[in-house]
Protein backbone atom coordinates (compact mmCIF):
# COMPACT_ATOMS: atom_id res chain seq x y z
CA UNK A 1 0.00 0.00 0.00
CA UNK A 2 1.28 3.45 -0.89
CA UNK A 3 1.47 5.36 2.40
CA UNK A 4 2.54 8.78 1.19
CA UNK A 5 1.45 10.91 -1.73
CA UNK A 6 3.54 14.03 -2.25
CA UNK A 7 3.63 16.98 -4.60
CA UNK A 8 6.59 19.21 -5.42
CA UNK A 9 6.68 22.96 -5.77
CA UNK A 10 3.92 24.21 -8.06
CA UNK A 11 0.95 26.59 -8.00
CA UNK A 12 -1.24 23.54 -7.28
CA UNK A 13 0.65 22.56 -4.13
CA UNK A 14 -0.12 25.87 -2.41
CA UNK A 15 -3.80 25.49 -3.25
CA UNK A 16 -3.86 21.89 -1.97
CA UNK A 17 -2.12 22.87 1.26
CA UNK A 18 -4.08 26.03 2.04
CA UNK A 19 -7.53 25.41 0.56
CA UNK A 20 -8.15 21.68 0.35
CA UNK A 21 -6.26 20.63 3.48
CA UNK A 22 -5.92 17.07 2.19
CA UNK A 23 -3.62 14.35 3.43
CA UNK A 24 -0.94 15.04 0.84
CA UNK A 25 2.58 16.19 1.61
CA UNK A 26 3.39 19.29 -0.43
CA UNK A 27 6.36 21.61 -0.85
CA UNK A 28 8.31 22.41 1.36
CA UNK A 29 7.57 19.25 3.41
CA UNK A 30 8.31 17.39 0.18
CA UNK A 31 11.32 19.30 -1.10
CA UNK A 32 11.78 19.04 -4.85
CA UNK A 33 13.11 22.14 -6.57
CA UNK A 34 12.96 20.85 -10.14
CA UNK A 35 14.17 24.11 -11.64
CA UNK A 36 17.49 23.98 -9.78
CA UNK A 37 17.90 20.22 -10.21
CA UNK A 38 17.25 20.30 -13.96
CA UNK A 39 19.81 23.07 -14.31
CA UNK A 40 22.27 20.94 -12.27
CA UNK A 41 22.65 23.79 -9.76
CA UNK A 42 23.40 21.46 -6.86
CA UNK A 43 25.02 24.15 -4.71
CA UNK A 44 21.93 26.40 -4.99
CA UNK A 45 19.66 23.42 -4.32
CA UNK A 46 21.59 22.61 -1.10
CA UNK A 47 21.44 26.26 0.01
CA UNK A 48 17.68 26.28 -0.55
CA UNK A 49 17.36 22.98 1.32
CA UNK A 50 19.35 24.39 4.27
CA UNK A 51 17.09 27.46 4.40
CA UNK A 52 13.99 25.26 4.62
CA UNK A 53 15.26 22.18 6.49
CA UNK A 54 13.04 22.70 9.55
CA UNK A 55 9.95 22.31 7.33
CA UNK A 56 11.23 19.37 5.24
CA UNK A 57 10.29 15.73 5.81
CA UNK A 58 11.30 14.32 2.41
CA UNK A 59 13.77 15.78 -0.08
CA UNK A 60 15.12 14.66 -3.41
CA UNK A 61 18.82 13.91 -3.49
CA UNK A 62 20.31 15.70 -6.53
CA UNK A 63 20.06 13.63 -9.74
CA UNK A 64 23.29 12.26 -11.21
CA UNK A 65 25.28 13.67 -8.29
CA UNK A 66 27.70 11.00 -7.12
CA UNK A 67 29.23 12.77 -4.14
CA UNK A 68 28.16 13.21 -0.56
CA UNK A 69 26.29 16.50 -0.07
CA UNK A 70 27.94 16.76 3.39
CA UNK A 71 25.09 18.04 5.51
CA UNK A 72 25.36 18.23 9.31
CA UNK A 73 23.86 15.34 11.31
CA UNK A 74 21.24 17.55 13.00
CA UNK A 75 19.78 18.22 9.56
CA UNK A 76 20.10 14.75 8.07
CA UNK A 77 18.41 13.14 11.09
CA UNK A 78 15.21 15.05 10.30
CA UNK A 79 15.09 14.51 6.53
CA UNK A 80 14.53 11.38 4.47
CA UNK A 81 16.19 11.70 1.07
CA UNK A 82 14.74 10.13 -2.04
CA UNK A 83 17.56 9.10 -4.34
CA UNK A 84 16.43 9.14 -8.01
CA UNK A 85 17.87 5.91 -9.45
CA UNK A 86 18.77 6.33 -13.11
CA UNK A 87 21.25 3.49 -13.54
CA UNK A 88 21.92 0.01 -12.21
CA UNK A 89 25.45 1.28 -11.51
CA UNK A 90 24.11 3.54 -8.73
CA UNK A 91 23.30 0.68 -6.33
CA UNK A 92 26.73 0.77 -4.67
CA UNK A 93 26.61 4.56 -4.23
CA UNK A 94 23.14 4.33 -2.67
CA UNK A 95 24.42 1.73 -0.19
CA UNK A 96 27.23 4.13 0.75
CA UNK A 97 24.79 7.01 1.24
CA UNK A 98 22.56 4.85 3.46
CA UNK A 99 25.37 4.63 6.00
CA UNK A 100 25.06 8.40 6.57
CA UNK A 101 21.56 9.44 5.47
CA UNK A 102 17.98 8.18 5.57
CA UNK A 103 17.61 7.14 1.92
CA UNK A 104 14.65 5.80 -0.03
CA UNK A 105 15.50 4.68 -3.59
CA UNK A 106 13.32 6.43 -6.17
CA UNK A 107 12.00 4.74 -9.31
CA UNK A 108 12.14 7.09 -12.31
CA UNK A 109 8.71 6.83 -13.94
CA UNK A 110 9.97 7.98 -17.34
CA UNK A 111 11.88 5.13 -19.01
CA UNK A 112 14.07 7.64 -20.90
CA UNK A 113 15.81 8.43 -17.61
CA UNK A 114 16.68 4.89 -16.49
CA UNK A 115 18.47 1.79 -17.77
CA UNK A 116 16.33 -0.77 -15.91
CA UNK A 117 12.73 -1.93 -15.61
CA UNK A 118 10.43 -1.97 -12.61
CA UNK A 119 11.06 -5.67 -11.95
CA UNK A 120 14.79 -5.11 -11.55
CA UNK A 121 14.06 -2.11 -9.30
CA UNK A 122 11.67 -3.89 -6.90
CA UNK A 123 13.93 -6.96 -6.71
CA UNK A 124 17.02 -4.85 -6.04
CA UNK A 125 15.42 -2.51 -3.50
CA UNK A 126 13.21 -4.68 -1.33
CA UNK A 127 12.81 -2.13 1.46
CA UNK A 128 10.92 1.16 1.16
CA UNK A 129 10.72 2.50 -2.40
CA UNK A 130 9.47 5.77 -3.89
CA UNK A 131 7.75 6.20 -7.26
CA UNK A 132 8.98 9.46 -8.79
CA UNK A 133 6.69 11.55 -10.98
CA UNK A 134 3.38 9.67 -11.05
CA UNK A 135 1.55 11.29 -13.95
CA UNK A 136 -0.98 8.62 -15.01
CA UNK A 137 -3.39 6.24 -13.32
CA UNK A 138 -1.37 3.36 -14.82
CA UNK A 139 1.69 4.56 -12.87
CA UNK A 140 -0.42 4.99 -9.73
CA UNK A 141 -1.70 1.40 -10.06
CA UNK A 142 1.87 0.22 -10.64
CA UNK A 143 3.05 2.00 -7.48
CA UNK A 144 0.31 0.28 -5.51
CA UNK A 145 0.80 -3.15 -7.09
CA UNK A 146 4.54 -3.14 -6.38
CA UNK A 147 3.97 -1.79 -2.85
CA UNK A 148 5.91 1.45 -3.08
CA UNK A 149 6.17 3.30 0.22
CA UNK A 150 5.38 6.62 -1.40
CA UNK A 151 5.23 8.58 -4.59
CA UNK A 152 4.98 12.12 -5.82
CA UNK A 153 2.28 13.06 -8.26
CA UNK A 154 2.37 15.56 -11.10
CA UNK A 155 -0.52 17.76 -12.15
CA UNK A 156 -1.15 15.48 -15.15
CA UNK A 157 -2.66 12.73 -12.99
CA UNK A 158 -5.23 15.28 -11.82
CA UNK A 159 -6.66 15.85 -15.29
CA UNK A 160 -6.40 18.57 -17.89
CA UNK A 161 -5.64 22.24 -17.25
CA UNK A 162 -9.31 23.16 -16.85
CA UNK A 163 -9.83 20.37 -14.28
CA UNK A 164 -6.88 21.60 -12.23
CA UNK A 165 -8.33 25.14 -12.13
CA UNK A 166 -11.69 23.93 -10.76
CA UNK A 167 -11.43 23.48 -6.96
CA UNK A 168 -14.29 20.97 -6.75
CA UNK A 169 -12.97 18.77 -9.57
CA UNK A 170 -9.47 18.96 -8.07
CA UNK A 171 -10.77 18.00 -4.62
CA UNK A 172 -12.71 15.05 -6.09
CA UNK A 173 -9.72 13.77 -8.08
CA UNK A 174 -7.34 14.07 -5.12
CA UNK A 175 -9.87 12.28 -2.92
CA UNK A 176 -10.08 9.46 -5.51
CA UNK A 177 -6.29 9.11 -5.47
CA UNK A 178 -6.08 9.06 -1.68
CA UNK A 179 -8.92 6.53 -1.41
CA UNK A 180 -7.38 4.33 -4.11
CA UNK A 181 -3.93 4.15 -2.53
CA UNK A 182 -5.44 3.64 0.94
CA UNK A 183 -7.62 0.72 -0.14
CA UNK A 184 -6.17 -2.70 0.76
CA UNK A 185 -5.27 -4.90 -2.17
CA UNK A 186 -5.18 -8.67 -2.48
CA UNK A 187 -5.94 -11.01 0.35
CA UNK A 188 -5.63 -9.43 3.76
CA UNK A 189 -4.99 -11.56 6.82
CA UNK A 190 -5.69 -10.44 10.33
CA UNK A 191 -4.55 -12.58 13.25
CA UNK A 192 -6.03 -12.08 16.71
UniProtKB/Swiss-Prot annotation:
Q: Which organism is it from?
A: Acidianus two-tailed virus
Q: What is this protein called?
A: Uncharacterized protein ORF192
Give the source's domain of life in one word: Viruses
Amino acid sequence: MVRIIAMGQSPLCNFIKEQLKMNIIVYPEFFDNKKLLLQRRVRDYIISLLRNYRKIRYALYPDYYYRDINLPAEITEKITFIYPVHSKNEVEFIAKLKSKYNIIPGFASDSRYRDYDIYWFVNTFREEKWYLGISTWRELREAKRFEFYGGDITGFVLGNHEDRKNPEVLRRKLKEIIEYVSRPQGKQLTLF
